[in-house]
Amino acid sequence: MYACSKTEIVKPQIEEIPFVVPSNFPDAVYKFDGNTLTNKGFYLGKKLFYDARLSADKSISCGSCHQQFAGFANLDHKVSHGVNNCLGKRNAPVLFNLAWQRE
């Protein structure tokens, strides 16, 4: 704690998550320089991904269309449903192996 010590500053420990590339995969396109994977960052991202308060009317989250059981795609509908149940023009793309996606 900073308030209890004037001589020693204790920095919080940040647990990094290793990014392991399978032996049969090419090098990842995305480089994690300056964006280290950490447990805190992972859990913050997960919380934001499933938080409906981030939508215009607080009714839908990213996870509403990018469904975990479906490889973070959407198997329930031909096209994604958005705010006010408006239909999109396409289905939610898969969120899987994004470190290898070029665009």
Q: What is the predicted role of each segment?
A:
Residues 1-44, 101:
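Post-cleavage N-terminal segment of exported redox proteins
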Residues 45, 57-69, 95:
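The canonical Cys-X-X-Cys-His
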Residues 52-56:
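Short, flexible, mixed-charge glycine/proline-rich loop motifs
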Residues 68-103:
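Gly/Gly-Pro-rich "capping" loops immediately C-terminal to redox-active cysteine motifs
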